[in-house]
Amino acid sequence: RQVVSLKATAELAQKEYEQRAAELEAEGNQISGSLNELKGMIKSLGLDSIVTSSGFTRPTNSGRLSAGTWHYGLNVNGGVHLGMDIAAGVGTPIFAAGNGVVLASADGCSNDGYIGNSCGEAQGGSRGGGNQVYLLTSINDVTYAVKYLHMSPRTPLKTGTVVNAGDQIGAIGKSGNVTGAHVHIEVFKLGTMSLESYASSWSGDLAFGAGWGAAGLNRLC
């Protein structure tokens, strides 16, 4: 009985930790800085010349899937972790999913992240996301946004960088709200609007209209 009780306690503690991680990120979800300035810079790149990719490129060449999408029960008041986590050593290269442009990025967080660390928002990304890249890409004539979080410092490509599928866009780190080295990845299906059209109308929402926390489960994308 004692073993069963200890196991249940450990599982509850893990769920509470996971919920807190999701809530922290949800508190800061809007790009910082001048959105109009960003749009002007993106427009000058001529994104309509980017050719659509024929499929998704794997984000890493090594590592393991350490977490998928979690949904927490009422015993911890709900909560959600959207996307997936790939655990690998610090410095492992992260590759672009497809041809596109870095719509937003954040750098300047150290690689000594911990649970509750809010670094990322002041650097231009989401709170707790550490060093991060938001890639706007076209794959099979469909536009997607791909979010990569918790990168090593000085590795994220800068906003406005045009990339090809498979180009390195950063490296795995331990920045922001984490307990170990990994990259958190989310994919948002945005429709058939061109890259340039989407970028010019983007509101700065780093959840791309899908919502954050439990609200993210109420949208299909």
What function would you assign to each model-found segment?
Residues 79-81, 96-153, 181-189:
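Zn2+-dependent peptidoglycan hydrolase active-site motif and core
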Residues 84-85, 165, 170-171, 182-188:
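Active-site scaffold segments
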Residues 52-101, 105:
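Domain-scale macromolecular recognition modules
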Residues 93-105, 156-172:
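Short, well-structured beta-strand-loop connectors
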